[in-house]
Regions:
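Helix-to-loop junction immediately C-terminal to a conserved catalytic motif
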Residues: 54
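ABC ATPase NBD coupling module
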Residues: 69-81, 105
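Q-loop/switch helix immediately C-terminal to the Walker
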Residues: 86, 93-105
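Conserved ABC ATPase "signature" region
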Residues: 108-123
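Conserved ABC ATPase signature
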Residues: 127-131, 135
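Conserved catalytic motifs of ABC-family nucleotide-binding domains
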Residues: 148
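Catalytic Walker B motif of ABC-type/P-loop ATPase nucleotide-binding domains
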Residues: 152-156
């Protein structure tokens, strides 16, 4: 029997207000090749859960593991990659340089196919600071995907996309899953909700089972 690549076990974390946690007793798991959508209203804890799975924080209680290791100890972009809401792309680099940065760090060939896949090839030599918010969001997704990570965590990946590019992003995330990545997405996007293997509903920081 296959082992989940992501396991969130009875996690309680943060403080929404005095004595009230941002996340309370949340559990989920994801297999390689699965798309897991994390859904909920603003303030329900989606972004906090993404940060925990991406290893940016360790949970106050409970455990979060990626490939059997605590998520907070994983520092390998090929194992665990993140698209945060705040993209943090170096503005002085070109679009192509930003997308391929993880390849350079590892001494690997560039991935011009990803520029094509995310409709960025025509912008390859443009400075990132000159790109639109939607273009920068697609750049950040492509950069997160460039090493084919075991797990990719994305916080609202279509929030700055028009309809056509939202379709494109959803398609590429499904392709990542087909290639074997576990794809965890915090989103309201009906395209991804419809295609998800699992939908985790958060309500006031708790996993709500409709």
């Amino acid at each position: 029997m296959s082992t989940p690549v992501v396991v969130v076990s009875t996690v309680t974390h943060g403080e929404r207000s005095p004595g009230v946690a941002i996340l309370s007793d949340v559990s989920l798991s994801a297999m390689a090749g699965e798309v897991v959508v994390i859904e909920g209203r603003s303030g329900s804890g989606k972004s906090t859960l993404c940060q925990l799975v991406a290893g940016l924080e360790a949970p106050d209680r409970g455990t979060v593991t990626v490939g059997g290791s605590p998520a907070a100890s994983v520092r390998d972009w090929a194992r665990l990659a993140l698209l945060p809401q705040r993209l943090g792309l170096p503005a002085e680099l070109t679009v192509a340089e930003n997308v391929t940065l993880p390849c350079w760090v590892r001494g690997m060939p560039a991935r011009p196919d990803l520029l094509e896949a995310f409709d960025l090839a025509h912008l390859a030599d443009r400075r990132t600071g000159e790109a639109s918010r939607g273009e920068q969001q697609r750049m950040a997704i492509a950069r997160a995907a460039v090493l084919g990570p075991d797990v990719i965590v994305l916080d609202e990946p279509t929030s700055h996309q028009d309809e056509a590019h939202a379709d494109l992003v959803a398609h590429q995330l499904l392709e990542l899953a087909r290639a074997g990545s576990a794809v965890l997405v915090a989103t309201h996007d009906p395209r991804l909700v419809a295609e998800a293997d699992q939908v985790v509903h958060l309500h006031a920081g708790r996993h709500h089972h409709p």
